[in-house]
Regions:
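Cytosolic, long alpha-helical scaffolding segments
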Residues: 1-225
Length: 225
């Protein structure tokens, strides 16, 4: 705990009135890019059954979640203090963005860990139908995450409102895949552990999409405040 506080103090000392916007935005953008990378690599290596890679990715996801949690616990108040001369809206949207980032990274950590545990315990591989449905959701989510990451990196949010259509389509794909899996389970076409992991993966994918969209919106408002 002392080490975490010390790191926070060091970050705080580096922040000035002039660079506070850039420092805070960089923190959010960098973490979101890492989340996208770890998520994509986790799914790809799950399809390939690469146990070693999945272990490394689960560890990376845990580190990202811990870092995000530290920022959330120790950085908010010191940074808000530095924002005293700025608008209240700026502080509000920064807090909200960190909250959504923290939720998204915790979800990613659970997602990656559950997948690694499943593969490490040599449970039954997903069926072709499960993989096909999951790939459809995964492709839609990656496309959406890429859009959000592009906005965060460039600071240009003109297309943000248009992503709502893609977001809704993703949620519909998740709902469809969930219903198809429930039907498979009812017909005893998949094992219990396989069904549980599959449904958990879909739920976390949906949750991450919602949280990243929310943090992108708050980052947009934070920069504009």
């Amino acid at each position: 705990r002392k080490r975490e506080s010390k790191l926070s103090v060091e970050r705080f000392d580096q922040i000035t009135e002039e660079n506070i916007l850039d420092v805070c935005s960089h923190q959010i953008v960098d973490s979101t890019l890492k989340l996208r990378e770890i998520y994509n690599d986790t799914v790809e290596n799950f399809f390939q059954g690469d146990r070693k890679a999945l272990k490394e990715l689960a560890d990376a996801a845990e580190r990202l979640a811990m870092t995000s949690s530290e920022h959330h616990k120790y950085d908010i108040l010191p940074i808000l203090y530095k924002m005293q001369s700025r608008s209240l809206d700026m502080g509000y949207h920064f807090v909200q963005a960190l909250e959504h980032l923290n939720e998204a990274t915790q979800s990613l950590s659970q997602f990656s860990e559950s997948i690694f545990t499943y593969v490490d315990n040599n449970h039954t591989p997903f069926t072709i139908d499960q993989v096909d449905d999951l790939k459809e959701v995964h492709t839609a989510l990656i496309k959406l995450l890429d859009e959000y990451c592009k906005m965060l990196q460039t600071g240009t949010y003109i297309q943000f409102d248009y992503t709502m259509v893609a977001q809704e389509q993703l949620l519909q794909l998740v709902a469809k895949a969930t219903k198809r899996q429930i039907k498979r389970a009812q017909r005893n076409q998949t094992r219990t552990r396989s069904s549980l992991l599959y449904l958990n993966m879909l739920n976390e994918m949906r949750f991450m999409a919602v949280q990243v969209r929310a943090l992108t919106n708050d980052e947009r408002n934070f920069v504009a405040a």
